[in-house]
């Protein structure tokens, strides 16, 4: 079974996104995957990248001991499932801040001496799955270019195993969705995550 890190991002526990999180966790545990859940809001993760921390950009991760758990999780997992709402066409600031702070030098990538391109370090990660919601329609999101999807499927993926696959599981138009549509979406999440993990 797959070592799976679930990164959950939503400030309101009663949100539909929390139902999505529960559906993902239920599926993964039922299928006997090893799961670590990180609830960034509940943990009060600080997404703020300070000037002092940015000055440490090319130093080892040990210079930021407050991120040791994040580093260990990233090095442990074989798959990451991001569960979050899409806001303003992209990743919530909390998630973007987590990426900015934890996908760091000597963790996600390294720039060897004399080289002009970075090399990926998270080669243990073979699957990236985003499970998200959009307030607007799929058509509107296509017009906007889906920057959140691009961040995960392009920018993040290249720091992983060269055979890493990224999958996008989205419910579009949630602002005008019916209870039936939301329940149908929740009922299919397990199957869709299963396909993505193959």
What is the role of each PLM region?
Residues 40-61, 178-181:
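N-terminal beta-loop-helix "entrance" segment that forms/cooperates
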Residues 16-23, 94, 147-151:
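Conserved alpha-helical elements of sugar-nucleotide-dependent glycosyltransferases
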Residues 55-75, 185-192:
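Glycine-rich, highly charged phosphate/nucleotide-binding loops
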Residues 140-143, 147-198:
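Glycine-rich phosphate/pyrophosphate-binding loop and the adjoining helix
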Residues 62-144, 148:
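Helix-loop-strand module that forms the ligand-binding subsite of alpha/beta enzymes
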Residues 2-33:
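N-terminal beta1-alpha1 ligand-phosphate binding loop
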Residues 7-9, 38, 83, 131:
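Short hydrophobic segments within beta-strands
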Residues 33-44, 167-172:
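A short beta-strand-loop structural module common to alpha/beta enzyme folds
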């Amino acid at each position: 079974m797959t070592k799976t890190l679930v990164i959950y991002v939503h400030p309101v526990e009663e949100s539909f996104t929390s139902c999505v999180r529960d559906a993902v966790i239920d599926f993964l545990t039922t299928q006997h995957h090893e799961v670590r859940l990180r609830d960034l809001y509940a943990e009060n993760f600080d997404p703020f990248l300070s000037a002092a921390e940015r000055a440490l950009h090319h130093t080892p991760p040990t210079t930021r001991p407050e991120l040791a758990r994040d580093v260990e999780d990233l090095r442990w997992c074989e798959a990451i499932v991001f569960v979050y709402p899409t806001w303003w066409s992209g990743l919530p600031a909390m998630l973007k801040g987590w990426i900015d702070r934890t996908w760091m030098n000597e963790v996600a990538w390294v720039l060897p001496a004399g080289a002009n391109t970075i090399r990926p370090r998270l080669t243990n990660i073979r699957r990236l799955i985003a499970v998200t919601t959009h307030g607007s329609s799929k058509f509107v999101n296509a017009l906007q270019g889906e920057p959140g999807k691009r961040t995960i499927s392009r920018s993040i993926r290249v720091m992983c195993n060269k055979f890493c696959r990224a999958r996008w599981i989205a419910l579009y138009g949630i602002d005008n969705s019916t209870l039936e549509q939301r329940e149908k979406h929740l009922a299919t999440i397990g199957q869709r995550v299963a396909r993505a993990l193959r």
